[in-house]
């Protein structure tokens, strides 16, 4: 619509192939990657997992890494009361008292390690996520936390340094 007018500017004349400018960097490959979308501020308790169809724009944070099923399990945990209570205690509240999903807060959240969750429980958690079943998610999260406690009681000290599960990329 305004391409001709923008092409007349100094920046466009200097590098004609980049006649446009954006505030945020654009990463075209990001659209195709599976990711979790976290709205900056929202009254909605549902967290969306994108299978690679959408590109996150302003006021949307995202977490990428792993397969779609892995991200659904993580999204379910992020929707749980266990994590929401942590977020409410960490963040400042905005716009009607809703917490913010900013990186400095998300990085402090205690989230169960997905790799030690029994497959049957993980499948149940994913099913609850797909059915928008918050009560089921909370029940699964409670069971996961009990299981995690038992695993760490049996193996109190990991023998090697554990690598992070995900790459947290925030826009």
Task: Give the label of every model feature segment.
Residues 113-171:
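Non-catalytic DNA-recognition/assembly elements of restriction-modification systems
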């Amino acid at each position: 619509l305004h391409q001709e007018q923008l092409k007349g500017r100094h920046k466009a004349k200097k590098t004609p192939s980049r006649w446009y400018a954006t505030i945020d960097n654009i990463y075209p490959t990001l659209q195709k990657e599976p990711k979790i979308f976290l709205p900056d501020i929202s009254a909605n308790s549902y967290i969306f997992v994108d299978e690679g169809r959408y590109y996150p724009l302003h006021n949307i944070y995202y977490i990428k890494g792993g397969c779609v099923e892995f991200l659904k399990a993580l999204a379910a945990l992020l929707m749980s009361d266990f994590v929401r209570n942590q977020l409410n205690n960490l963040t400042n509240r905005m716009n009607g008292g809703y917490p913010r999903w900013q990186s400095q807060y998300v990085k402090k959240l205690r989230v169960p390690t997905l790799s030690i969750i029994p497959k049957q429980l993980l499948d149940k958690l994913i099913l609850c996520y797909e059915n928008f079943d918050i009560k089921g998610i909370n029940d699964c999260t409670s069971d996961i936390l009990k299981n995690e406690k038992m695993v760490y009681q049996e193996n109190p000290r990991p023998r090697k340094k554990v690598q992070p599960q995900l790459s947290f990329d925030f826009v």
